[in-house]
Structure formats: C-alpha cells, structure tokens
C-alpha cells in the first residue's frame, strides 16, 4: 500500500577474484514482536573495476582480502540465480531510441535503471493490467553513453496457459559508428492475471 514502510536487507553471498554475488530481501517494516512480511528477493553479481583504467581489479587484493569477512553463504535466498539469456534468431527489432542527458549516470554511462525502464516500456499499459511481472533478469555486456542510439530486440521464448517469457537484447550505435554492439541482455517472465 502507499506509504507502507519497508526494509531492504543485503548481504554478500560469495566472492570470486573479480566478482561478488550479493543477495537482497525486501520486507515490511514491523515492530520487533511481529513477523516481517517478505515482499521479494533479489540476486545480483557485481564486478570491481579500476575507475581510471576500466579494467577488472582482484577483489581479494583490496585491504588484504577483507571482503572474506563479510561473506554470508549460510543466509538463505530462495530464488534461482540468473542464467545466461539466450537469444534465438527470431528476435525482432521492436524499438530504437536516442539517448539523452536524463539517461546517464554520474560516470556518463547509460544508467542501469534507465535500461530497465526502457525494457519495461516495450509492453503497453494494457499488457500490465493483465500480466504481473514475476521475474526480471538483466546482464550488462558493454557500456553505452549519451548520444548512442539503442536498438531493442524482443523474442517470446515461452508461452504457457498462465505465463509468458520474453528475452530482450539491446544493441547500440555510437554517434559515428554504423555497427551494432550488444550492451544488455534481459529476460522478463510475466504471469497472466
């Protein structure tokens, strides 16, 4: 409901040389005597890069491997990890957009949330009146910047009586480059109301 308070818990599930797995639990904020209502869970993978060279950094070399003290592999997160989104040859170009100032983050890259908004905008409001977004996966492949043109390819990969699943690929053209480069792959699973 509007104005309900909620809490996001987060923890590092695992760490590898260049990546960490971080889990999330979203639940209602309650008094200490009440059981918190769980609204959902999330999983993410993060990479550490040198902000000047844009190259990966060995996480275990930072502060003598301090990250190991923050790993909690015992805390449950009952959703499946993301899988690699596989696009078939049937993906159709459904939209092309230009990118502007409001699409970028402080580093000058297209903001992660903007990619998600643009993907969700591929489905009209009437679709959302009859379908609930049950699962959303996104993988960032390359960076894009203000002025790049983004192309959205959509493919329905599964349809059952109560479920529809779509794979989405986003490519870019730079200002002076006609070649398309893949920047994002995503999967959206909807449940019919």
Where are these regions (language model features)?
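Hot-dog-fold acyl-thioester-processing enzymes
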Residues: 47-132, 193
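HotDog/MaoC-like acyl-thioester-processing domains
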Residues: 1-80, 140-149, 155-193
């Amino acid at each position: 409901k509007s104005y309900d308070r909620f809490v996001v818990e987060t923890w590092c599930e695992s760490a590898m040389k260049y990546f960490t797995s971080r889990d999330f639990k979203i639940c209602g904020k309650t008094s200490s005597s009440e059981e918190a209502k769980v609204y959902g869970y999330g999983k993410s993978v993060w990479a550490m890069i040198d902000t000047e060279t844009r190259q990966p950094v060995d996480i275990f070399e930072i502060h003598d491997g301090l990250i190991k003290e923050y790993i909690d592999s015992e805390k449950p997160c009952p959703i499946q990890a993301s899988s690699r989104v596989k696009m078939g040859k049937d993906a159709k170009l459904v939209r092309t957009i230009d990118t502007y100032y409001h699409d970028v983050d402080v580093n000058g890259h297209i903001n992660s949330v903007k990619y998600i908004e643009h993907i969700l905008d591929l489905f009209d409001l009437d679709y959302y009146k009859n379908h609930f977004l049950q699962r959303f996966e996104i993988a960032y492949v390359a960076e894009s910047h203000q002025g790049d043109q983004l192309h959205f390819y959509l493919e329905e990969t599964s349809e059952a009586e109560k479920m529809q699943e779509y794979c989405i690929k986003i490519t870019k053209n730079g200002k002076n480059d006609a070649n398309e480069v893949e920047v994002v792959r995503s999967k959206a699973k909807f449940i019919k109301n």
